[in-house]
C-alpha cells in the first residue's frame, strides 16, 4: 500500500490542492516559498503521532475569499488517501490496520484519513453575529481603513480560536468515525528536517536511536541464521547472555574488592551525619546489563590505515549519511514482527527535507540511489524528499518528480511525467525519453527557475547574459535560466510547460531560434541546402525554398527569430547590424585582413558595393556571394552589410569565437562611460525576447 494523494484545503499556502504521490520515491521540488515544507507538515499532522494537531491562526490559508469567511467559519481539511500499490499484495497486517478506514472494499482497496480543524457547530450562530457587526461597521467606515478580511481573522483569533477542535476521521467523513490512535501506531513516520542535529542523536550509545539499533542487531549472526529454528536461536542467544552475566558479575566483584577499604571511609561519614539508624547502613550494590554497556559505545570512523577518529570529528555530510543509515536500520527494527510482535510497524515512511545538506554533488546522486535500493528491498515503503538540488532531481526519473509552484492564490502542483500526451491523450514516449536523457544536473534547473530561455547553441548560451547587461536587463532578478538544447528540439520541452496541459508547469518560456533559410535545386537536389538571405526566394523556377517557420506554441511559450528578409544566424545578424564593429573580430576569427578592410570600406561613405566585392578572395563560395548580391534587389547599404555578415559568418567557429566574443563584449562594458566604449547593436529579436522575459 502507499499514500496515493493528499488533498489540502485552507492550510497555509494551500487554498485547495490535491497532490498525487508515487508508490516509491517522491521528489518534491520547487522554488523557495513554493510550499514544500508546508506539504510535509500537512502529511505529518495525520501520520506523525508526535506532531501537534492543534493549529494556530497563521496555519489558515490567508488566500481564502472574503465572502467565504463571511458565510462560514474557516475550516482546515487534510485528506490522505491510501491505495494498493502496483506490485503490492495486501498483507493481513495491512488489512487489519486499514479495516475501518476503507472506502473501497475490493482487491484494489482504498482507505481515507481526514484531519479537520473546525469551529464546533454550537458556536456558529455567535460567529455569524460577530461577522454581521464587522460587515455593517465596514460599510460605514472610510474605504482606506483595514479591509474586512483582516478584521475577521483578528476576530477569529481573539474570540473563536480557543473553541476550535481537531479530529481525524476514518473512511467516509459523513460517518463521523474517529481514528483509533493505536492503529496509527502501526505507521512508522521518520522525519529528517532541514535543520537537523544528527550528531546529538547518534554519536553515543546513550542516545535512544543508536541504543535501539545496537540492541536489535546484537547477536544478529544467530537471529539471521536460517538453519536454526526459533527455539534454537533463543537457546543460543540465552547462552551468550548467561555468559555475559557471569563475566559482568566477575567485573562487579572485582570492583567491590577494590572499593572494600575505601568504602568504609566513604560510609563513615554517613554514621557521623546520622544517616545510619536502626542498624541500617548505606552500601553499594548493582548489576551490569547489556543495555547499560551500550552507553559506553561511541561511534567512530576507522580508516584503512587503522587510524580511528570520533564521529563528532567527521564531516557534517558524512555524519548525515551515517545518521540516515542508522535511521533506516531503526525502521527495520520497528517493522520486525518477531522482535515487536503486534507492535511492529506495518507502513514505514521516510521523509527527508533537503537531503543535499552538506553533501557534494556525487554524494547526492549516490544517496538517492541508496534510498531507491532500500525501497526496492522493502526496508521502507514510501519516501518523500523535498529539495532545491538539481543533482538530486537528475538522480530520479521524471515519474518521481512533483513540482510545486506559486500562483496568485497560493500554491499549485505540476507533474512533469504526465505532460507528455498528444491531442488524443496518447503518451508521447519519444519526447519523454528525450527530456529524461536531457535533464542532467545543469539542465534540470529548468524545473526550478521562474522563467526559462531556451537557445539552440553555445553562441547564444554564452552571449545572451552579456547582451542582457547591454540592455540593462537583470536575468538574475527574474530567476531566468538560459538553457542550450544543442539544436532545434524545442517541441520536446513544450509538453513540460504548455499551460493548456493541466499537469504542466505554467512558467514563462522563451525560445531563440535562427531563421536558417534553405533552398533545393528542383532538378538536381533531393535535400535542402543552406542559402544566404539575399538568395532566398530569388529564383523560384530553379529552386524550392524553405526556412524555420516555428511559431509560438502557447500563450506562455514564445519563440523569437531573425526577420524574414535579413535573418540567418546569430553570427550573421551581429555582423549585419554592426558592420564596422571590429570588436566582433576575435583571436580565432579567420580572414582578419579581409574583414578589417570590409569594415573600413563600410565606414567610407564613398565606397561602392563593388569595392567590397573586390576585397573577397577568389573562391567558389565568394563567387556565389558576388552572384547573389548582384542578383538581389537590396539597397546598396543592405548589400554592403550582407557582404560583411556573410564573410564574417564564414570566418568564425561557433564555440571558440563565442567565448572570445563574450569576453570582448564584457570588457567593452567595463569601459561604459569613457571614450573607449563602443556602441553595440543587439539583434532586435533578442531585445524582444529579453523584454518579454523581464516583464
Regions flagged by a language model, labelled:
Residues 69-73, 105-108, 181-185, 316, ...:
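Conserved catalytic network of the ASCE P-loop NTPase/AAA+ motor domain
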Residues 1-48, 292-295, 299-442, 658-660, ...:
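Switch/communication elements of ASCE P-loop NTPase nucleotide-binding domains
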Residues 54-70, 86-231, 242, 426-427, ...:
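Glycine-rich phosphate-binding loops of NTPases
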Residues 1-110, 117-120:
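Nucleic acid-processing catalytic cores of prokaryotic defense/repair systems
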Residues 88-94, 123-127, 199-203, 392-396, ...:
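Switch/connector loops and helix/strand junctions flanking conserved nucleotide-binding motifs
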Residues 514-643:
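Activity-critical C-terminal alpha-helical subdomain
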Residues 373, 378, 393-510:
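RecA-like P-loop NTPase motor core
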Residues 186, 198-352:
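Extended helical coiled-coil dimerization/tether regions that scaffold
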Amino acid at each position: 500500500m502507499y499514500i496515493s494523494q493528499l488533498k489540502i484545503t485552507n492550510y497555509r499556502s494551500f487554498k485547495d490542492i490535491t497532490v498525487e504521490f508515487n508508490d516509491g520515491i517522491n521528489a518534491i521540488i520547487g522554488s523557495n516559498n513554493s510550499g514544500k515544507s508546508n506539504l510535509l507538515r500537512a502529511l505529518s499532522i495525520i501520520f506523525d503521532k508526535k506532531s501537534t494537531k492543534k493549529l494556530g491562526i497563521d496555519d489558515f490559508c490567508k488566500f481564502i475569499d472574503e465572502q467565504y469567511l463571511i458565510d462560514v467559519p474557516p475550516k482546515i481539511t487534510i485528506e490522505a488517501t491510501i491505495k494498493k500499490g502496483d506490485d503490492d499484495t495486501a498483507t493481513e497486517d495491512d488489512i487489519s490496520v486499514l479495516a475501518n478506514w476503507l472506502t473501497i472494499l475490493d482487491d484494489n482497496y482504498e482507505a481515507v484519513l481526514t484531519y479537520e480543524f473546525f469551529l464546533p457547530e454550537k458556536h456558529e450562530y455567535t460567529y455569524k453575529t460577530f461577522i454581521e457587526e464587522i460587515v455593517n461597521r465596514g460599510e460605514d467606515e472610510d474605504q482606506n481603513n483595514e479591509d474586512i478580511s483582516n478584521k475577521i481573522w483578528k476576530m477569529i483569533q481573539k474570540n473563536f480560536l480557543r473553541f476550535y477542535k481537531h479530529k481525524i476521521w476514518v473512511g467516509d467523513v459523513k460517518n463521523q468515525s474517529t481514528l483509533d490512535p493505536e492503529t496509527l501506531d502501526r505507521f512508522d513516520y521518520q522525519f529528517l528536517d532541514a535543520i537537523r542535529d544528527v550528531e546529538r542523536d547518534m554519536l553515543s550509545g546513550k542516545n535512544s536511536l543508536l541504543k535501539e539499533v545496537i540492541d536489535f542487531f546484537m547477536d544478529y549472526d544467530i537471529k539471521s541464521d536460517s538453519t536454526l529454528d526459533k527455539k534454537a536461536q533463543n537457546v543460543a542467544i540465552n547462552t551468550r547472555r548467561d555468559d555475559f552475566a557471569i563475566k559482568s558479575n566477575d567485573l562487579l566483584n572485582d570492583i567491590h574488592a577494590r572499593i572494600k577499604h575505601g568504602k568504609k571511609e566513604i560510609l563513615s561519614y554517613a554514621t557521623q551525619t546520622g544517616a545510619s539508624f536502626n542498624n541500617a547502613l548505606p552500601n553499594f550494590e548493582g548489576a551490569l546489563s547489556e543495555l547499560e554497556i551500550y552507553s559506553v559505545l561511541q561511534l567512530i570512523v576507522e580508516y584503512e590505515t587503522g587510524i580511528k577518529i570520533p564521529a563528532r570529528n567527521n564531516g557534517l555530510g558524512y555524519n548525515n549519511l551515517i545518521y540516515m543509515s542508522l535511521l533506516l536500520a531503526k525502521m527495520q527494527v520497528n517493522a520486525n514482527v518477531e522482535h515487536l510482535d503486534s507492535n511492529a510497524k506495518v507502513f514505514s515512511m521516510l521523509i527527508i527535507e533537503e537531503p543535499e545538506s552538506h553533501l557534494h554533488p556525487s554524494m547526492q546522486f549516490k544517496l538517492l540511489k541508496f534510498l531507491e535500493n532500500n525501497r526496492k528491498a522493502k526496508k521502507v515503503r514510501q519516501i518523500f524528499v523535498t529539495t532545491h538540488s538539481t543533482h538530486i532531481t537528475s538522480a530520479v526519473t521524471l515519474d518521481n518528480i512533483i513540482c510545486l509552484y506559486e500562483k496568485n492564490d497560493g500554491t499549485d502542483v505540476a507533474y512533469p511525467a504526465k505532460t507528455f500526451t498528444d491531442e488524443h491523450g496518447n503518451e508521447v514516449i519519444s519526447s519523454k525519453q528525450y527530456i529524461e536523457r536531457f535533464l542532467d544536473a545543469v539542465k534540470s534547473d529548468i524545473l526550478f527557475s521562474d522563467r526559462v530561455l531556451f537557445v539552440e547553441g553555445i553562441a547564444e548560451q554564452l552571449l545572451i547574459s552579456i547582451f542582457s547587461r547591454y540592455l540593462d536587463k537583470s536575468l538574475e532578478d527574474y530567476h531566468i535560466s538560459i538553457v542550450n538544447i544543442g539544436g532545434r528540439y524545442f517541441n520536446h520541452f513544450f509538453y513540460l510547460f504548455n499551460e493548456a496541459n493541466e499537469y504542466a508547469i505554467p512558467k514563462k518560456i522563451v525560445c531563440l531560434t535562427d531563421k536558417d533559410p534553405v533552398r533545393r535545386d528542383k532538378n538536381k537536389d533531393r535535400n535542402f541546402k543552406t542559402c544566404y538571405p539575399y538568395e532566398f526566394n530569388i529564383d523560384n523556377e530553379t529552386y524550392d525554398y524553405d526556412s524555420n517557420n516555428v511559431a509560438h506554441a502557447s500563450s506562455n511559450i514564445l519563440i523569437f527569430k531573425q526577420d524574414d528578409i535579413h535573418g540567418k544566424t546569430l553570427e550573421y545578424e551581429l555582423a549585419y547590424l554592426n558592420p564596422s564593429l571590429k570588436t566582433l573580430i576575435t583571436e580565432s576569427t579567420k580572414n582578419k585582413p579581409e574583414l578589417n578592410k570590409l569594415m573600413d570600406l563600410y565606414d567610407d561613405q564613398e565606397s561602392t558595393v563593388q569595392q567590397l566585392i573586390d576585397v573577397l578572395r577568389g573562391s567558389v563560395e565568394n563567387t556565389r556571394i558576388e552572384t547573389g548580391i548582384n542578383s538581389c534587389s537590396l539597397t546598396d547599404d543592405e548589400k554592403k552589410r550582407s557582404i560583411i555578415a556573410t564573410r564574417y559568418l564564414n570566418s568564425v567557429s561557433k564555440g571558440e569565437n563565442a567565448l572570445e566574443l563574450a569576453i570582448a563584449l564584457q570588457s567593452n562594458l567595463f569601459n561604459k562611460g569613457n571614450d573607449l566604449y563602443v556602441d553595440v547593436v543587439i539583434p532586435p529579436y533578442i531585445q524582444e525576447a529579453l523584454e518579454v522575459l523581464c516583464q
